[in-house]
A protein has these predicted regions:
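N-terminal entrance/gating region of PLP-dependent enzymes' catalytic architecture
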Residues: 1-145, 428, 432, 436, ...
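Active-site nucleophile and cofactor-binding loops and adjacent substrate-binding regions
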Residues: 119, 148-158, 187-188, 245, ...
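Short loop-beta-helix segment that forms the pyridoxal 5′-phosphate
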Residues: 130-163, 210-213
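Short Gly/Ser/Thr- and Asp/Glu-enriched loop/turn motifs at secondary-structure junctions
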Residues: 143-145, 180, 405-410, 442-448
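Conserved PLP-enzyme active-site core in the AAT-like
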Residues: 157-324
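Active-site C-terminal subdomain of aminotransferase-like
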Residues: 292-396
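Conserved PLP-binding catalytic core of the aspartate aminotransferase-like
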Residues: 402-430
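PLP-dependent enzyme catalytic core of the Aspartate aminotransferase-like
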Residues: 443-483
């Protein structure tokens, strides 16, 4: 043992403290249903409970874990609660948590193959597994012209797709001289907000983002897309990319990929497909129809951190021609040069993303797939969809309520027929109760309540209780009247 002074945690203490953390996490999951799903703290309350200055001397680990329980836990909205039905889920699981712990313990930085070969090769291999598991086009396999990479989120995947599309449309002139303001992107108004952010970052500009009208089911209209592309060409614009969605955030709408894909193919336009939430459903053969037309896509992404029990962050981003992505993003300073890179025999994922550094995200995904197996994952996806369909049926059978959009998978959009003010009050009452957490959207200007079934440990009793609580709070509001 060295006699040098050290403030590091000893290996013995690390073992003991690590066991305490695992026990704390396990206990948290055992008691998670005892907490209000939505945190009840007020703005600034957490900071007010913390010291104004950092400690000069180190504190015992027991004090840290005590303060997590006392100071931090009250400010947590419990995303892993089985009664969390808000937004889209950001679920986790025991194998994912353990895989992430190992990733943190190894502490690798996987920017290059050479900086940790296993980090790169496991990622490539697991993403190839997913192509097979989801029935994706073979062009997304690493053995083809394309391949996959793990991004932090679908937002980053969309940005990378737009950057690659921009360079292809300009013959890589934009990287050299910047954008001229003539590139145009297309998406439905239901597309994720990250599309708008990405066109700003990529230099296309929000005025060059065309929101194409949707049909009665909130899906993009192909004929309107074709008409807008023609108008833009006549005006001297350069159609650059179409961002289609399989399972929009507001309503789970499914854009018609076969028709959109043919339009993109005929016009030489990049097609990016965002299936962040719904993509996991394709694990089940009976739901793979959502991917019809994906053979036209130049890029595609879905989020295992939403519905495949792999804790945040983990987005799987695929491209049909990896050279186009790499050529758009690659920069090789001398300090990154190495024999493996220059051999051309390896993948350097730094060229597939905006940041240079990258975590070993594939490890937790590998753990999840190996723990559950394909059939285990399918079981839980099917169960979630069945529970959502049961909830949708209850809505349809109650004359006070109506479905606000089709419910093809695990998201149900509904509202009370009394109007927006009633629905806003209902949502507020439900969330204040702490018994569950729901969020809203607006469709055709109407206030809509969303319920998404996708949390790892959600069971039928939680969905049944959600419907009971909706009924109870509805009855109270109806008695109050004035709507």
């Amino acid at each position: 043992m060295s006699n040098e002074k050290s403030y590091h945690m000893s290996i013995e203490d690390f073992r003991r403290n690590g066991r305490e953390v695992i026990d704390w996490i396990a206990d948290y999951y055992e008691r998670i249903e005892s907490f209000p799903v939505l945190s009840r703290v007020q703005p600034g309350e957490i900071r007010a409970s913390l010291p104004t200055e950092a400690p000069m001397d180190g504190e015992p680990f027991e004090a840290l874990l005590h303060d997590v329980e006392k100071l931090i836990l009250p400010g947590i909205t419990h995303w892993q609660s089985p009664s969390f039905f808000a937004f889209f889920p950001c679920n986790a699981s025991a194998p994912a948590i353990l895989g992430d712990l190992l990733s943190s313990g190894l502490g690798v930085q996987g920017m290059l193959w050479a900086t940790s070969p296993a980090c790169t090769e496991l990622e490539t291999h697991v993403l190839d597994w997913l192509v097979q598991m989801l029935g994706l086009p073979e062009k997304f396999l690493s053995s083809s012209t394309g391949g996959g990479v793990i991004q932090d989120s679908a937002s980053s995947a969309t940005l990378c797709a737009i950057l690659a599309a921009r360079e292809r449309a300009t013959g890589y002139a934009s990287n050299k001289r910047g954008c001229k303001g003539d590139l145009v992107a297309y998406a439905s108004p239901q597309a994720h907000s990250s599309v708008e952010k990405a066109v700003k970052i990529a230099g296309l500009g929000e005025e060059n983002l065309r929101h194409i009208e949707v049909d009665a089911h909130w899906a993009l209209r192909p004929e309107s897309l074709a008409a807008q592309i023609a108008l833009d060409r006549q005006a001297g614009k350069v159609p650059c990319i179409v961002c289609a969605t399989i399972g929009t955030t507001s309503s789970n709408a499914l854009d018609p990929l076969p028709q959109i894909g043919r339009i993109c193919e005929d016009n030489g336009i990049w097609l990016h497909v965002d299936s962040a939430m719904a993509g996991t459903a394709a694990l089940c053969p009976e739901f793979r129809s959502i991917n019809e037309g994906l053979e036209f896509a130049d890029s595609y992404c879905f989020n295992p951190h939403k519905w495949m029990f792999t804790n945040f962050d983990c987005d799987c981003f695929y491209v049909a021609r990896r050279k186009e992505l790499i050529d758009a993003l690659s920069i090789l300073p001398d300090y990154l040069r190495n024999k493996a890179t220059e051999s051309g025999a390896v993948i350097d994922y730094r060229d597939w993303q905006v940041p240079l550094g990258r975590r070993f995200r594939a490890l937790k995904l590998w753990f999840v797939i190996r723990h559950y197996g394909v059939e285990g994952l399918r079981h839980h996806v099917r169960r979630h969809i069945a529970l959502a369909q049961q909830f949708a049926l209850w809505v349809q059978q109650d004359q006070r309520f109506e479905l606000a959009a089709p419910a093809p998978l695990n998201l149900v959009c509904f509202r009370h027929r009394a109007g927006d003010a009633f629905n806003e009050a209902l949502l507020d009452a439900l969330n204040r109760s702490g018994d569950l957490y729901l969020t809203h959207t607006k469709l055709n200007g109407r206030f809509i309540i969303r319920l998404c079934v996708g949390q790892t440990y959600t069971e039928s009793r939680h969905v049944e209780r959600a419907w009971e609580r909706i009924g109870e709070e509805t009855a109270k509001l109806e008695v109050r009247g004035g709507w």
